[in-house]
Structures are given as C-alpha cells and as structure tokens.
Amino acid sequence: MGKRDRTEDDEVVTKKVKLDKKDKKEKKEKKDKKDKKDKKDKKDKKDKKEKKEKKEKKEKKEEVSDEEEVAEEKPKMTYTASANTIKSSGEYTQCDDLTNVSQSTIDNYFKEHTITIEGEQMRPTMEFSHVTLDPRITKVLTKFPRPTPIQAVSWPYLLAGKDMVGVAETGSGKTFTFAVPALEHVLSTSGGKGVRVLVVSPTRELAMQIYDNIKELCDVVGLHAVCVYGGVPKEQQRSDLKRASFVIATPGRLCDLIDEGSCDLSKVSYLVLDEADRMLEKGFEEDIKKIIGSTRPTGRQTVMFSATWPPEVRKLAEGFMKTPTKVMIGERDELAANKRITQSVEVLDPRAKEGRLLDLLRQYANDDFKILIFALYKKEATRVENTLTRRGYGVAAIHGDLSQQQRTKALDEFKKGEKNILLATDVAARGLDIPNVKLVINLTFPLTVEDYVHRIGRTGRAGKTGQAITLFTEHEKHLSGALINVLRGADQPVPDELLKFGGHTKKKEHGAYGAFFKDVDMTKKAKKITFD
C-alpha cells in the first residue's frame, strides 16, 4: 500500500470519526431539545391543572354565594304541625284545621285514592280550608268543591319549595296542582322582571290548555303568561316574552327561541315538566336537557308529572332533580286503565268498522252527549270526517294535516258544544282536558296498548265515569294479549273472540327499544334449541 493510499484511508477514517461525532452531537442536541420540551409540557400541564383547580374552587365559592343569595331571597321552608299559612317569607306550616283531622281519616283518604308517597310524609290538604293562599287565588278555587287527590297530596310539598315527581292518571287536576304553588312562589319571592316559571309540555294542544288554566290565575294576581309553540309565526311570541313571568311551551319552539336569543330563562326558579313520559316518547330528551341547562342552576324548584313511571323517566328525574318526593295516585308502575271507565271491545271484520261506527252514533249521538272518535291515520280521519258530515253529524277534527288555527277552532267548537263529535288522531290522545266526554270510540286500534290507555283516558276524568268502545280486527291481533291484560286489570269483560287471538303476553326489555310485549302461547312447551 502506497503513501497516497494510506492518506486516503486516514482521510476516510477522519471523515467517519467527524461524522460520528456530528451524529452524536445531533443526537445529544435532539435529546436535550426533547427533554426541554418534555419539561416544558410537564410544567404547562401542572400550571393548567393548578389553574383548573383554582377556577373550580372559585366557581364553588360563587355557587355557595349564589345559594346564600337564594336563601336570602327565599328562606328555607319549615314544617310544623300548628298552621298551614303561606307567609310572605315563603314559609309553609300546617294549619290547625288540618292538625285536628284524625289520623284514621288521613289513612282512609290514602287508601281510598291509592296514594303512595316516597319521601317525607306530609298531611294532604283535603279541603281548601286546610291551606291558606293568596285571597285572589282562593276566590278562583271556590268554584271547585275540594282539591283533587293529586292537588291535596302535592300542595304541601310544592308550597314548601320541594322538588316533586307526580305520577297520576290524566284528568286528575295536574295543572292547578303545579300552577297554584307556582303563583305563590312568584308572589312570595322577589326576582324582578323576567321569566320566573316555565312549564314544558309535549304538544301544542296541551300547552294551550295549560295556558288557558294558568292565565285565569295570572290575570287575577296581575302576572303575565305566554304560550309558546310551533306552527305559528314567532313575532307575537317574541313580543309577549319580553313581559312574561310565566311561560308555557313546547320543546321545539322554545329551543328555537333560546337559540336566537329571544327567550332568556336564566331567572327561572320554578320549572315544570308535564307529561314527561310523552316528551321522551316523542324524542325530546336532548331538547329537555338543553332547556334545563338554560335555567338557573341553583335555587330552582323542579316539578315533573308523568302518567307512567318507566325507567327512562326515572333516569331523567335522577339527572336534574334534588331528592324529589314521589307522589303516586293509583297503581302506576304497570300500565293500568282508569277503573271508572266501562270498556267494551268488539272484534269484527276490518271492512265492517265504518258501518258499525254509524250504528254506534245512531245509538249515542245527541246534543248533550260528547263523543270522541280516534282514527289511526290522517287520511282515515279525513275520510271518516267527510262521511259523517255528509250524514248530517256535527263533526270537528284535529290531526297533523290541519293548521294550528284549524285545530284550535275544532277543539273550541267541541268544548263549547257547537259540535258534539270530535274526530282525532293520536295527536290528541294525551293530556287534553276536554270536559264531559261521555264516550270514546276507537275506530282503529292504536299502535301500542299504552296509547289505547291514554286514548280512553279522555273520558272518566275528574272523578266522573265514562265509556269506551273499541273496534278490534285481526290486523291488531299481535296486541290482543296486552289488551286482555289491561281489561282484566281494570275488571272489565274480555270477549271470547279476543281470547282466540292469544290470551297471554310477556313483557320484555331491550336496551335500545325499551319495554315491549311478545305474544306467547302458554299451552305449548318451550322448544329446546341445541347447537352442534
């Protein structure tokens, strides 16, 4: 090897050494840079955590401050056995008249009306003399003989500012149950201008009905109420909201007004969810959560009413109510029909339904006899309405194809007796308080037995008796077992023709679909399935 070759080798080695040194240096710099970055990230994370903890501590402090402010605004309720006076401070105590009622009388009242209370026990205000309200409100109530069971049991809790869940049949006087304490709440506390009471309802018709009842009370005490629902222009509603203390609303329209900044609910301290189970059925859960989130987070009294008490309603209540008292009138955990309603089911050929309907109308229709007919589909309702009108019957109709103005007019005509027959789809099946409906006719059976119970609940309201006639065909035979259960549960006769479709059902639960019924032939043995 020559000198030149050795020199080249040395240069290569030297170059390699330099490259190695450079690589090591770059790696070291890279490592140092990474360590520095990790150290910075760690510090930032720590600072962020400390900042978050500081913020939470501050918010907690503000929350306590808010609660103290609310406590000053509305002192803590007290419960004694000496008086039932609603004082200007918002205090509730039990009156002497109620204290003097014997315990056996109270026990008999609970037994007679199948009343169950989960939570603190308070005596029911069975007579108007058992509760002292604003004289102007008392004057409105004098047109009624006495509080209904749900009112008698609920008023002590609601007047005391407690959260409450009420589970009772439709037509039990729920509106005044929450409206009377709501008025006392507003009158006895200082909250300034703005919406103080919010009632959320699943349908336009029910919202308007609640509004009509509440407006009567608001007018006598000088408070302003507004009804907010879809299907009509927003302009008037926006204007009315500016001076409203009470808002009765459907979820969809209310959320629209919240989004556009036309409805401020930050001062709402009395919140009512009426027909909570129906709102969940209609898919309003997210809207409800949004609405609740728009009200004041502390110092809010929350009231929920539901015709049934399924798991999804319980879960909703647990999410935003503070240890509510649960009041149940009747056996409500399982689907049950009002026992004051005489139910009869006729099994017939689908083509014979309209002929049978005409027979029933010839038998029952007169000027003093209000009849509510339920159809399943809008087109069916329109066709039957035209048929009955041609036959000379005075028929009003409400269904989804009609405008809000047309539906309101139809309901008014029926309520006032201008027309004695109301034809409806299930839009009117829940919550509507139509006085003195003597007969409900199910021309077409609904999609669920739950809807059947709510349909027939339009009669037999407020302690009165009623009648329901259902035309049942083989198209609905998959619901026969569940219907039989309802009939038997209400001590009603079950026709042999219905039993032929199948007399037993098993109630199943599915995570996605909820509770449903499956037809089962109990005479057959279960099949054993094996897999290879």
Curated annotation (Swiss-Prot):
One GO cellular component, as annotated: nucleolus
Domain Helicase C-terminal: 356-502
Catalytic activity: ATP + H2O = ADP + phosphate + H(+)
Alphabetical UniProt keywords: ATP-binding, Helicase, Hydrolase, Nucleotide-binding, Nucleus, Ribosome biogenesis, RNA-binding, rRNA processing
Motif Q motif location, chain numbering: 126-152
Chain's gene name: DBP3
Cell location: Nucleus, Nucleolus
Stretches with biased composition (Basic residues): 15-58
Name listed for the protein in its UniProt record: ATP-dependent RNA helicase DBP3
Gene Ontology molecular function, alphabetical: ATP binding; ATP hydrolysis activity; mRNA binding; RNA helicase activity
GO BP: any one term: rRNA processing
Domain (Helicase ATP-binding): residue spans on this chain: 155-327
